[in-house]
């Protein structure tokens, strides 16, 4: 198995690199302290109404109360703080639900107030298409989502970003290139019955090029069908992922084996 060979090449103090762990991310992060350069992930958006079944994922039930969801997110960011190397970033793709438009803002506010992280940037991701909001007389069709760039509060002026120097002033002060906080990328790499809420390899590749370097270790706490890992292989980054669904882990491994064995197909 090609992906098994890739895993065996590298370990971080006994933990396999380039592997998706079929477990809760809070368990994985206990073994990753201080080893990760960046987190790139898209959490469940908590868009399913309580007592409603059958949307989004094959295992996870995306229907917490607002308070439960916020507390859960705070616990996850405590884990991120423990695993990130100095000046590492969290790139957190999140959007709001049609019926719960405030949760996203509540989460961000509590992260800033109650965690060691602050919001460094907001990237707008324009997707190629959007489902028309034909049932609403007053809500717009949403064709954008957001990637929230979080850094530690103590590293607001030093967190990793790959902006290059375009010129240097007489005083020695560098001028950096102009990089817009706007990315156009595909919606996804085709959703599956296992996970209807995936993002695209194209989006993740652009984020990797902005915030990581070749050989960096990237962690995805909600790996799903392996999109972050897929992008990492292309851009020569190492990855570790967590995923609750055994079936999604199996799907991702098959997908990544194809990526490794037949890169010319992509």
Question: How should these model regions be labeled?
Answer:
Residues 253-266:
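Class I S-adenosyl-L-methionine-dependent methyltransferase module
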Residues 2-6, 10-251, 265:
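Core catalytic lobe of class I
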């Amino acid at each position: 198995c090609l992906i098994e060979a890739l895993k065996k090449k590298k370990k971080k103090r006994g933990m396999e690199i380039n592997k998706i762990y079929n477990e809760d991310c809070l368990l994985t992060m206990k073994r990753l302290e201080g080893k990760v350069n960046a987190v790139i992930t898209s959490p469940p958006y908590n868009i399913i109404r309580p007592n409603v079944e059958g949307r989004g994922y094959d295992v996870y039930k995306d229907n917490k109360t607002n308070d439960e969801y916020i507390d859960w997110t705070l616990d996850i960011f405590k884990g991120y703080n423990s695993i990130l190397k100095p000046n590492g970033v969290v790139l957190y793709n999140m959007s709001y639900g049609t019926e719960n438009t405030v949760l996203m803002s509540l989460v961000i506010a509590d992260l800033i107030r109650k965690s060691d992280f602050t919001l460094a940037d907001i990237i707008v991701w324009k997707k190629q298409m959007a489902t028309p909001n034909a049932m609403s007389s007053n809500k717009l069709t949403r064709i954008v989502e957001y990637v929230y760039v979080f850094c530690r509060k103590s590293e607001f002026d030093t967190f990793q970003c790959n902006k290059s120097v375009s010129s240097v002033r007489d005083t020695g002060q560098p001028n950096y290139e102009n990089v817009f906080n706007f990315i156009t990328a595909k919606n996804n790499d085709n959703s599956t019955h296992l996970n209807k809420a995936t993002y695209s390899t194209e989006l993740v590749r652009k984020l990797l090029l902005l915030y990581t370097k070749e050989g960096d270790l990237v962690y995805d706490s909600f790996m799903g069908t392996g999109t972050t890992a897929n992008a990492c292989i292309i851009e020569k980054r190492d990855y570790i992922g967590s995923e609750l669904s055994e079936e999604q882990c199996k799907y991702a491994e098959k997908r990544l084996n194809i990526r490794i064995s037949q890169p010319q197909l992509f």
